[in-house]
Design a protein with these regions (language model features):
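Selective recognition of specific alpha-helical transmembrane segments in multi-pass small-molecule
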Residues: 43-52, 166, 171-173, 226-231, ...
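Transmembrane helix-loop junctions in multi-pass membrane proteins
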Residues: 17-30, 99-101, 113, 171-187, ...
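Membrane-interface helix-loop-helix modules in multi-pass membrane proteins
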Residues: 21-27, 31-32, 78-141, 152-156, ...
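Membrane-interface "cap" regions at the ends of multi-pass membrane proteins
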Residues: 1-14, 46-101, 282, 321-322, ...
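Loop-to-transmembrane helix boundary motifs in multi-pass membrane proteins
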Residues: 153-171, 364-371, 426, 445-456, ...
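Extracellular loop-to-transmembrane helix junctions
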Residues: 29-49, 107-138, 147, 190-202, ...
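Extracellular/periplasmic helix-exit of transmembrane alpha-helices
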Residues: 296-312, 367-433, 470
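Flexible loop linkers connecting adjacent transmembrane helices
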Residues: 53-80, 106, 120, 129-158, ...
Length: 639
């Protein structure tokens, strides 16, 4: 009875909070950011309690008695049984990158309401299912990648198209994520020093847990957190010191440094660097977001951005397209992310100890990421709209005033953080300003705005970099799988020359895109690539569910698949037209060629995705109509 009463109370609280947010209650008043925090927290708790249980028990039929690939194929490099909390930390750190931070910040152009509703509904009913179903499918198939699962489930044509699409998409995605790290750390010695220090700390944690004190997770965690806090606070003393020149890096130097790190993390055994660093980063990620939520609760800031702005109809100074479809591809990982399917069928299934942990890791980590996206949206929308646009666009103050968004406090904000923040597009700077505004408003924190601003930039880089290292490793898996069709030893992950060669090719590809691109070209391509991949993953998940004899539950992936294909193909068409228009108006031959290449890349990604979609549709109707015998591809490992 007590439990039932608690869930009723949580449901009522969620309903009231959502009513305030959407304007049913007090529609004429500006709302308090506290309502967004409460609504999201309650909605996500309810979703995890009921929808996650439904997916695990009815749709997937989790079996905790089955032996997982991590145990059966243990090799100490990629396949390695891992504690559920450490694996949650790795998985969350790997999936939670630039999307939930930068995406909502940029999408705030359309107002706070569309983005908030999409983050809430998209993550709870779409993103969670996407991640959980693909993780389950991979665990049941020896930890196979999404490309291999697609080949097994939908056939060779769709499988090959999916493999090339996924490889191409992940390279573009890694470039987008890497660019966000570069923008956050450029000329920031504090952040660069702290990020660099997490690498030896993670190596020590890995050796401590698996060699010095095997299985002592609590000890390792305590030591790691203490060392991480030292790295964070000691970084404050780097600017202006004799170490400043070593960590005050240009963008090109940062690209090279990140590429070297990504290569090393991709080749080393997963337990040595990747897993402990991701686990360590998760403490900082979740801890900072938790403190940000506490700050919002304590100071209760008012949302300054209108519910819906005039840019919803025809685009604005930050995002050139209208709300549909560009809001959905801009928010990306904050609601639904195809990149997650690469982690859910890459590193995570090879480290899972027990199937019962699948909902906790796949479903739970996505909900936490959704909450991160809500906090990023709040950080954007508590800024005065004119100041928000002044930071995130290159428009003059006069031009912003002419379109109805006068700049009010931009000079004051620049003085408070000791940095000129005007005309700094990309989302990283405005997010840091928003976070610093919340932290410095907490009692006792006044006057620490510059500290919190630099801390926020470091936090963003730490948040995003963990997806770059894990993504590079996953891309290496995929490239080795494809290469193995030509030269068989390449497909063996234990073969070091293959690991090194594939990692080098992957790192070279995404680092080149960062060198040659910018946020205005890479981020829209990243959004389209990411969401096209999500649509493909939903399609593969639908076939997996149908072939498992659960046709009546196929709607959990089929409905999101249809929506994501409709959204991303529309966005692809509009983005191609946008790049073609920019090419026709380019001031130089080089710029025109760049925009034409961008248009071709989007067309190529969309074409591959359509091929996969057609193959999925054909297979789906054949299975449903009974024309083809259903053959399950699961590997039965029972303990």
């Amino acid at each position: 009875m007590l439990k039932k009463s608690i869930w009723i109370l949580v449901s009522v609280t969620a309903s009231i909070s959502l009513s305030v947010v959407v304007g049913i209650i007090n529609p004429s008043e500006k709302i308090n950011a506290l309502w967004l925090v409460v609504a999201a927290a309650c909605f996500y708790v309810i979703t995890y309690r009921f929808y996650a249980s439904f997916i695990a028990a009815k749709v997937l039929t989790i079996d905790e008695n089955r032996t997982t690939p991590a145990q059966k194929i243990f090799d100490g490099i990629d396949y390695h049984p891992t504690n559920r909390w450490i694996l949650f930390g790795h998985h969350f750190a790997a999936i939670a990158g630039a999307g939930p931070l930068i995406g909502p910040m940029l999408a705030a152009q359309f107002g706070y309401l569309p983005g908030f509703l999409w983050i809430l509904i998209g993550s709870a009913l779409g993103g969670t299912v996407h991640d959980t179903v693909i993780l389950f499918a991979s665990v049941r198939r020896n930890g196979k990648s999404l490309a291999q699962i697609a080949g097994d489930e939908i056939g060779p044509v769709g499988g090959i198209a999916a493999a090339f699409a996924i490889l191409f998409i992940i390279i573009v995605a890694l470039a987008g994520l890497g660019l966000a790290v570069v923008n956050a750390l450029s000329q920031s010695p504090w952040g660069t020093f702290t990020i660099a220090l997490t690498i030896p700390i993670a190596l020590f944690m890995g050796i401590y847990l698996y060699r010095i004190r095997p299985g002592k997770v609590a000890e390792m965690s305590a030591i790691g957190v203490i060392l991480l806090l030292f790295a964070v606070f000691s970084g404050h003393y780097i600017p202006g010191s004799f170490l400043d020149p070593f960590f005050n890096l240009s963008k090109n130097s940062l690209v090279l440094s990140i590429a070297i790190y990504g290569f090393i993390a991709s080749v080393l055994p997963v337990w040595l660097l990747l897993a402990p660093r991701d686990y360590l980063s998760t403490y900082m990620k979740i801890g900072t977001i938790f403190l940000l939520a506490v700050g919002v609760i304590m100071i209760a800031p008012t949302i300054q951005m209108p519910p819906v702005t005039r840019f919803a109809e025809g685009g604005g100074p930050i995002i050139p397209g209208r709300l549909f479809p560009f809001m959905f591809i801009t928010i990306a990982c904050g609601a639904i992310s195809g990149f997650h399917s690469l982690i859910s069928s890459g590193t995570t299934p090879k480290m899972l100890m027990n199937e019962r942990d699948i909902p906790f890791i796949g479903f739970g980590a996505m909900l936490v990421e959704g909450f991160v996206a809500v906090m990023a949206l709040i950080a954007a929308t508590i800024l005065i709209p004119g100041d928000y646009f002044a930071i995130n666009s290159k428009l003059s103050f006069e031009a912003l005033a002419a379109i109805g968004f006068p700049v009010e406090r931009i000079s004051e904000l620049s003085e408070m953080v000791k940095t000129d923040v005007a005309g700094r597009p990309g989302g990283a700077v405005s997010l840091a300003v928003g976070m610093a505004s919340i932290f410095s408003a907490i009692p006792g924190m006044k006057g620490l705005m510059p500290y919190w601003y630099n801390f926020a930039l470091m936090f963003e880089a730490l948040f995003i970099l963990t997806t770059v290292d894990a993504g590079t490793r996953v891309a290496r898996f995929l490239l080795q799988e494809l290469g193995g069709k030509v030269y068989k030893p390449l497909s063996q992950t234990r073969w070091l020359p293959g690991n090194i060669g594939a990692s080098l090719l992957v790192v070279s590809a995404w680092s080149y895109l960062i060198y040659s691109g910018n946020i205005s070209s890479i981020w829209p391509m990243f959004g389209v690539a990411n969401q096209l991949l999500a649509a493909v993953a939903f399609g593969v998940g639908t076939i997996v569910i149908v072939k498992s004899g659960k046709l009546k539950y196929a709607w959990v992936t089929f409905i999101p698949m249809v929506f994501m294909f409709a959204t991303t193909l529309t966005a692809s068409y509009q983005l191609i037209e946008l790049f073609r228009d920019k090419a026709s108006r380019a001031r130089s031959v080089t710029d025109a060629l760049t925009f034409k290449i961008d248009a071709f890349l989007v067309f190529f990604m969309a074409t591959l995705a359509v091929i996969v979609l057609i193959d999925i549709a054909v297979k789906f109707f054949r299975y449903v109509s009974g024309r083809v015998e259903v053959i399950r591809k699961e590997i039965d490992f029972r303990g």
